[in-house]
């Protein structure tokens, strides 16, 4: 993938994970370019199918385009930062991300966004005054 494409995806996301909103500047691990529709499921490598993604969200998402809502056990697609508004599906409650919809809850569950260590990291960033990022810069809105 050309470096210019990575730069475009990074700029569009304002340097934040498009799923959990973690700023790249506050994670020691390199961020990934996520195929929203995974390559395993014929997802193309085009800007419209790429999301800037922290390593944790990327690794937990893997090739999954969907998952089960933990409240209803019904299969739902994961959040799509190209076609959906982040604030329609998620909201912050201190360091915990809350799902407002089945898509939000499913995404939080599959990507393990509220794992204890990830919450602890966000609480530290909140204490430092650098999280959550101001909407819309990291939300794609």
Model-derived features with residue positions:
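Short beta-strand-alpha-helix junction that forms the catalytic/metal-binding core
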Residues: 17, 41-61
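Histidine-centered catalytic micro-motifs used for acid/base chemistry in nuclease
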Residues: 30-38, 52-54
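Histidine- and/or cysteine-centered catalytic micro-motif in compact active-site loops
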Residues: 22-23, 36, 41, 57
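Extended charged
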Residues: 3-4, 12, 23-26, 44, ...
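Short beta-strand segments
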Residues: 18-20, 28-31, 49-50
